[in-house]
C-alpha cells in the first residue's frame, strides 16, 4: 500500500488519513519588483547560470530537528533573505557589489504516519524583532503551517521586501527573515520514554527576479579552509590539562554541569584561551630560577616564560601558559643545569596549587623538595610533573579538578580567565575526555577530564578554519565496523555536548574517532545516546 498516493482508494478503517494530503496552502505574500527596477539606476545587470535558477539546493545550516523536548513557540531555525541563503549565490556574491530579488524556498520534512505535531513557517518583515514571539503572534505574519507527517515538499516564496532599489553585499541591511517555529508539540502514539526526532531540510533557489549588480574587480583569491577534526582515535590522543594519554570518553549526571578549565581551551577557529599553549610536554611545567627558604626544604621559583625569557605579570593571561588549572598537590622532578660547567642535578619536588604561596600570575611558586642545599640560585631550573598526591584521612578529596587555583594568591582575583562552559540546550550534557593521573602518594582522585584533546587544540590553531555556524555536528565512528555510535555538538567556543538524560553515567571506549558531518544551528536536536533509536532523516 502506498500511504500518500493520490489515486489510492479511500479507506474506511481506523487508519484512514494517517498522512495528510499535499499541502496546497499558499503563503500570503504577493510578488514584488525585483532586480528589474534596480537595473535603470544601477547601470548594469548580471546573468546567473540557469542551472542555479532551476534547482533547489540545501541552504547552509539548512537542517534542523524537532523532538518532544522542543516547546511550542521555540524558534527551530531562522535565516534572513540574502545571497548566503544559497551556497551558489553566496559564492557568486564575492564577485558583485549588490543584489536585488527574492528566493523560493522548499521545505522537506521526514514525515511518517506515527508522529503528530505542526511547524509554522513565517516571513517576518525587515527590522522586526523575532525574540519573544508566541505561536499566536507568528500567525499574524504571512505564514504556512506544516504537519510533520507531510511527505511532499512545501514551497514558500520569499520576496525581497526593501525600501531601496538594491542591497549592497557589504552592507548589513535588514531583510525579510524566514523563521520556523514549533506550533504544536511533537508526540507519538507509543507509551515508551524513548526520545525521537524528526529532521527537516530547507532548500533554496533564486526567484526569476533575482540578479546581481555591479561586477567588482577581482582580487587575490583567498581560499576558505574547510573545517576538519583530526582523524585520531581517542586512545591515540593526549590530555590537554596534564601530560598523560586519554583513556575514555565520559558523560553523565555525576559529572560537573558548569566547568571552567584554563588549559585545553581553544575555539574551533583557532583562538587559544586561558593558559592554553600548543606543546603537550609543557603542560603543568614551571621554569625559572630558585631561591632557598632558610631552615626548610622549600624553594621559591621566580618564573620565566617557556622560552626562558622574562615573564611579564601584566600580560593579559590568567597565569604563565601551561600553569595547572586545578587545586591539588602535584609531585614531580625539579631539575637544574649549571651554566658555567654544565653540571646537572634533580630532586623530587611537590607544588601545592591551593597554597597561599602559589602565585604564578605574580611570577612565583613554592616547591617542597627533599634537599636543602643542592640547588643553586640564579640557574635554569625546571619542574616536570609526574603525578598527584593526597594527604589526610578523607580519601580522594584531592585533587579537585574543577576548582580553579588562586593564580594571584588568596588576596588577589583571577583575571583574563577563559569563560565557563555549560550545555545550552535541554537534554544535553558535556562530553569529557578522561585520563587517569599517576598517583604518587595517599589516595588521590586520579580522574582528570578535559574539554578538548591537546591534538585538537593544535589542529584548530594550525588550520584556523572559519566557523560557518555556532555548532559543528560530529559523529563518533567505530573504525573497525564503520558504524556511527553517537552524534554530538562541537560548540564554537570549544566544548562538546551529547544528548543524555539518563540517571546513569556513560563511559565510552577509546577506540573510535570523531568525524565532522556538517554545520548546524544551536537548536539542532541530537539523537539520544545509550539507546537503539535512530533518527528519521529527510532524504
Swiss-Prot record:
Q: Where is this region: P2 sub-domain?
A: 275-417
The segments labelled Protruding domain in the record are 222-539
Record-annotated site: Cleavage: 223-224
Annotated region described as P1 sub-domain 1, given as residue ranges: 222-274
List every stretch annotated P1 sub-domain 2: 418-539
* Organism domain of life: Viruses
Q: Name one GO cellular component term.
A: T=3 icosahedral viral capsid
Q: Which UniProt keywords apply?
A: Capsid protein, Host cytoplasm, T=3 icosahedral capsid protein, Virion
Residue ranges of the region described as Shell domain: 1-221
Asked whether the keyword Secreted is assigned, the reply is no
Family listed: Belongs to the caliciviridae capsid protein family.
Coiled-coil region(s) at which residues? none
Q: Which Gene3D superfamilies match?
A: 2.60.120.20, Positive stranded ssRNA viruses
Q: Does the keyword NAD apply?
A: no
Pfam families tied to this protein: Calici_coat, Calici_coat_C
Report the InterPro entries cross-referenced here.
Answer: Calicivirus_coat, Calicivirus_coat_C, Rhv-like, Viral_coat
The molecule here is called Capsid protein VP1
